[in-house]
Each structure stands twice: as structure tokens, then as C-alpha cells.
Amino acid sequence: MAWLVLSGILLCMLGAGLGTSDLEDVLPPAPHNCPDICICAADVLSCAGRGLQDLPVALPTTAAELDLSHNALKRLHPGWLAPLSRLRALHLGYNKLEVLGHGAFTNASGLRTLDLSSNMLRMLHTHDLDGLEELEKLLLFNNSLMHLDLDAFQGLRMLSHLYLSCNELSSFSFNHLHGLGLTRLRTLDLSSNWLKHISIPELAALPTYLKNRLYLHNNPLPCDCSLYHLLRRWHQRGLSALHDFEREYTCLVFKVSESRVRFFEHSRVFKNCSVAAAPGLELPEEQLHAQVGQSLRLFCNTSVPATRVAWVSPKNELLVAPASQDGSIAVLADGSLAIGRVQEQHAGVFVCLASGPRLHHNQTLEYNVSVQKARPEPETFNTGFTTLLGCIVGLVLVLLYLFAPPCRGCCHCCQRACRNRCWPRASSPLQELSAQSSMLSTTPPDAPSRKASVHKHVVFLEPGKKGLNGRVQLAVAEDFDLCNPMGLQLKAGSESASSTGSEGLVMS
């Protein structure tokens, strides 16, 4: 009995062991190096809202997007992103970062988007963003930034969107852009800061593609006439930054915050501004017209020779020597831009960017190129000529009908046809008597009867001939035209029809 109990216990233990092994084989394995407090999904790693005070360790190397927002991170360790060679987007918003430190983004050259918004950053030093050569979008809004080093963004050659709104910046260098340059930058948000002074010449020298998305609203700017004329011109040109936030552009009439008024709704504040001060602030773009297939050359003429020249196409493509990507545009050694054969895709604004040590600030020149299709050749036989020819032919036919005599053969045919249809071959005595009475009657017939009778034959009495059997002989004139009964005339003779009638008419 004891042997049987021991055997049963051993079998149960063996079955339990086999069941555990099978269960482990069914469950999916945990993701490779995924922290327990994070969520890993393919190449996305989310550690948001976990209350982290320090960076997690042993992150998966396959991550292309890392979300560490809504935590309590206070600092970033140098080189902490080195294992993440595939990282393209890093979200660090809503933390407690006060400084970035040198080397925080070393080995993150593949990063395209960096979100540092809603932190506690107060300064941005020259080397804080080293290693981000391919960065395209940088979000620094809703911090406490009060100062930017002159070269704070040096090395971010691919940066196109920079958001610095909702900070405490009191100045910004539009000439140097703190190391950014103008070749790639398309969006610059400086709204809701403490900007009290802006260099108007530097602002006017910016290219149009940057002015279009340069946000300066909600700043305590002074109500300056030059600034008013410049922003007014941008508003009239329909730049989106002015159009979208028209009511948010304000200025201070006095040096107190309570004197803030809206730029475009209180124009009476600027009624004493001279309009003559407006020209010269901003150079107008030069208008050029070209036809498809023509050659075009644009020159970047600056006040002094420039050492570096670059162009921006209407498609926001940076053009430097030797040529564009499609090969249709070439940048020559002297800095000019040449288009061999103009096409419709070349229509738009070309911007020349010139810089150099002898230039006080970067200069930009703009060319608005309008491309027109070649005019088609005029038609050799148009509708107007056809109409004129038809009128001439019609006039010739009318003149021939009026003045050309008809052919004799046609007249004989007409007379034969009319003789057969219009005049009977033998008339009865009753018909002759009716003709006499209608001719010699002194009372004209009624108007309706006259209108109804269309074919009337004129008859007359021949003088010198007596009536036969008590009747007057009626004769038709020898020149009686059977084809034209309306044009008949009485036969001329020595005696009139009245005297003929005096010989006496026998009526039955």
C-alpha cells in the first residue's frame, strides 16, 4: 500500500512539472530589453507618465521613437542615447529639466524631432545641442528661457521648424539667427515672449518664405512707425503669420503694459506716422516674365561682393553650386542662377541669400518669375475671312441677278410654258363678252375682287373694224407679253380707247 501511495505522489509531481513546461512554451516571450515600466510596440518605446526621476537603463536598440514625456526628469546624462542608433523622434516634454548640459545628445545624429517643451530651461548654451546635425524640428516652447547664446543653434544645418513661444526672451538676433542661417529655416515662432525691441532692417531683410511663418504676436513691442509700416505691408501681402493671428499683434503706446493696443484695429495711434518712411524698409521683389522654352538668368547683386551665395527655389529647394536636383537649374561660379529652358514648374519666387564679412547683415534678393506659355501661330484661314468671302459671293450673285440679261433659250421656254398655262387656246363667246364688259365698265370692281384677281389681261378695240354679228371684235395686242401680264400697255394708235368705245357697243 505504501508503495502505491509513493508511486502516485511521484506521478503527480511529474505531471505538474510537465504542465508548467507546456504553459511556459505557450506564453509569448517579453520584448527584448524592454523595461518593465515601459510599453514596447515594434519600434516605438513609450515610458510616458510613469513618474520617472531618472532615465531608464537597458533600452531596446530597435527603438525609433522614444516617449519620456510627463515625468519628473531633472537632468540628462552624457551619451545616454548612444545605443539608440535608429532613434528618429525623442519626446521629453512636461518634465523638470533645468539644463541640458554638454554631450546630452551625443551619438544622436539620426534624430529628426526633439521635443523639449514645457520644462524649466532658463538658458541655452552654445554646445547644448551638439550632435544633432540632422535635426529638423525643435520644440522649446513653454519654458523659462531668458537668454540664448549667439551660437546656441550652431550646427543645426537641417533645422526647418523652431518653436520658442511662451518663454521670457527679451531679444533675438534676426541677423545671425543664433547660428541657424536662412537656408533651411521655414518656421520661427517667437510669440508670447518679452521682446521689447526688434531691428527693423534685419527683420525686413529676411526672405519671404521665412516672413510667411515668422510669428511675433503677443510681444510688448513699442508702437513704432517703422514697425507698423512693415507689418502693415506684410498684412497686405497676405502672409499667413499676419493673417492667421491678426488680432494678436499688439504694441505699447506707452511704456506700461496697460497701454497695449492692437496694431490693425487702432490705426489712429499711427496717424502721425509719415508714409514716406515706409519705402526703403523692405526691397520689393523684382517681377520677371518668361515664356516656356526661353533661357533665364538671375543675378544676386548685393551692395558689396559676397563670399557665400545660395538660392532657394519656389519649391523651397536649396540651390548651391553646381545645380539643382533635377538638373534644370544651375548656380554659376559668380553666384548667378541660370535656367536653360524655362518650364511652368519654375514659376514662383526665387530668393538669393548672400553673406560675407563685408556685409553688415545677410542680404536677400527676391525675383518673382511668371512663366507664360508660348502663343500659338495665327490660323491661315480663320472664321472672319470665311464670312467676308461669303458676303462677297452673295453680292456678286445679287448683281448678276439684277443686271445680267437672261438667255434666249430660257425666254422661249418661259413663253411656251406661260402660253400653255395662262392663256386658253380657244375662248367661248361668253368669255369674250365678259372680257368686254369688264374692260368698258365705268364702275371699278370692288377692292377685294381686285385683290383676288391676280392675272388680268388688258384688251382694247381695234379702230376701223366693225363689230361682227352685232358684237365688237376684241383683239389682243401684238406685243402682248404672256409671261408678264402685270406690265401690259394699251396699243398705241391714232385713236384712243374712248373714241373706240364711241362707235357703239352691242350688249346682249
UniProtKB/Swiss-Prot annotation:
GO CC annotation: membrane
Keyword Transmembrane helix: yes
Residues in compartment: Cytoplasmic: 405-508
Glycan-bearing residues: 107, 142, 272, 301, 362, 368
GO BP: cell adhesion; heterophilic cell-cell adhesion via plasma membrane cell adhesion molecules; negative regulation of neuron projection development; nervous system development; positive regulation of synapse assembly
Stretches forming LRR repeats: 62-83, 86-107, 110-133, 134-155, 158-178, 184-207
Single GO MF descriptor: protein-containing complex binding
Described purpose of this protein according to its UniProt entry: May mediate heterophilic cell-cell interaction. May contribute to signal transduction through its intracellular domain.
UniProt name for this protein: Amphoterin-induced protein 3
UniProt organism field: Mus musculus
Gene: Amigo3
